């Protein structure tokens, strides 16, 4: 991570109907760099063609995501509160089953259903499941049952590897002091994960 780039916090404003998360997308290269997994009844990492369920990280809390728009390079992060607000927004707008492929509005997966949504919240005792033990507090995990066999096969064969959310967000630059505090916290979190 380059320290000289600005960091922006992404959030939604629950009072502003224009900010929302409208879709989750199955993508080949998730920005948070976390691939999803498929689960069987008995063995943890095998595919179960009857269930056709994929599980993974939808949003990784406090994970700096590199972005480049035009000549500007920067990082964006979702903090725990922003992710909590996204969950509320998802629920009140009924967007749980909105799933597409590679953020293409013309490639909506009509036969997919969210069957699990779980936000890690250590304070409340909602700790990370063993498979996701290295995920940050506040991260959001989801599972989709995908009945569309073609899309499921694309996930199974590794063409689609993870989730990526899409929507309209509030983006604010973190102050320099906050940026340094944030980077220090990220470094400490990474160190603790490596222990």
Where are these regions (language model features)?
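Signature of dsDNA virion morphogenesis modules
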Residues: 1-195
């Amino acid at each position: 991570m380059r320290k000289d780039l600005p960091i922006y916090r992404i959030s939604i404003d629950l009072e502003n109907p224009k900010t929302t998360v409208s879709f989750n997308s199955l993508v080949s290269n998730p920005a948070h760099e976390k691939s999803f997994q498929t689960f069987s009844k008995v063995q943890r990492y095998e595919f179960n063609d009857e269930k056709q369920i994929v599980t993974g990280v939808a949003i990784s809390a406090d994970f700096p995501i590199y972005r480049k728009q035009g000549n500007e390079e920067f990082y964006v992060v979702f903090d725990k509160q922003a992710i909590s607000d996204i969950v509320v927004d998802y629920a009140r707008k009924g967007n749980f089953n909105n799933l597409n492929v590679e953020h293409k509005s013309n490639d909506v997966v009509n036969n997919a259903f969210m069957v699990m949504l779980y936000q890690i919240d250590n304070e409340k005792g909602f700790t990370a499941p063993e498979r996701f033990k290295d995920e940050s507090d506040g991260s959001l995990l989801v599972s989709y049952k995908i009945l569309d066999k073609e899309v499921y096969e694309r996930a199974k064969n590794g063409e689609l590897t993870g989730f990526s959310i899409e929507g309209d967000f509030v983006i604010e630059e973190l102050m320099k002091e906050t940026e340094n505090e944030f980077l220090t916290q990220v470094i400490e979190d990474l160190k603790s994960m490596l222990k």
